[in-house]
């Protein structure tokens, strides 16, 4: 039997949300044909995510999600999600918190896959893909 070395970790996330979030992550990885991976999702407070954003992106503000591809050859990365921002955005977009976390999991992973949202063309491409995956998870017919 082949041993599966692929790992998806969730740190500091509510346990009841993890099963669906793993499905969201696996859906992105499958759609992008990523076969070997180790991805860590870490929930942090606003202070920590602002610190990461300032240090690595030179942007001195809070963000909802920030992704780091650590070892590209093996698709190993860390994705940090702000607990407070995700809760605020859930209310703002009329989602449950679980839905918003799934959306940010999808978004963060797409960044690791090379998608960007820094200009209109790439943002449209990324958000189209993101919305399609999100709808598959939550709005099956």
Swiss-Prot record:
Domain of life from the UniProt record: Bacteria
Cofactor binding description: Binds 1 zinc ion.
Record bears the keyword Metal-binding: yes
One BP annotation, GO: rRNA processing
Broad class of enzyme this protein falls into: hydrolase
HAMAP family: Endoribonucl_YbeY
Family stated for the protein in its record: Belongs to the endoribonuclease YbeY family.
Protein name in UniProt: Endoribonuclease YbeY
Native organism: Endomicrobium trichonymphae
Species classification: Bacteria, Pseudomonadati, Elusimicrobiota, Endomicrobiia, Endomicrobiales
